[in-house]
């Protein structure tokens, strides 16, 4: 007797760098455990590898995570987190010196709620990866990928 197949919702998003449609599922308990374990280590390499593994597990179809620009990975992870845990997060700013308090630390921290579904990538229409040095010579640049983080 075969094990039952879990039915999980599948979502789509568009990669900012290529406008390619990517299908993904929310992360499950096993992916959340990978992330929590990595965050406890406080080692950037372990956290980066955990994010890559979670994306590989949750993205459907062929997509090479190692070749994606870092902003695509961050965007995908935000979308994944929004569908898995919840769209809204609360970000707290620590007390900081402010002019209204004669340069002393403000007494209260500031909390801001962010809806991850509303996070958008703004692309300049004139953006190009080509940089012309002269009329005849140019350089084609590439976006940094996740390997630069290790």
Where do the PLM segments sit?
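Long C-terminal interaction/binding lobes of large macromolecular proteins
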Residues: 1-150
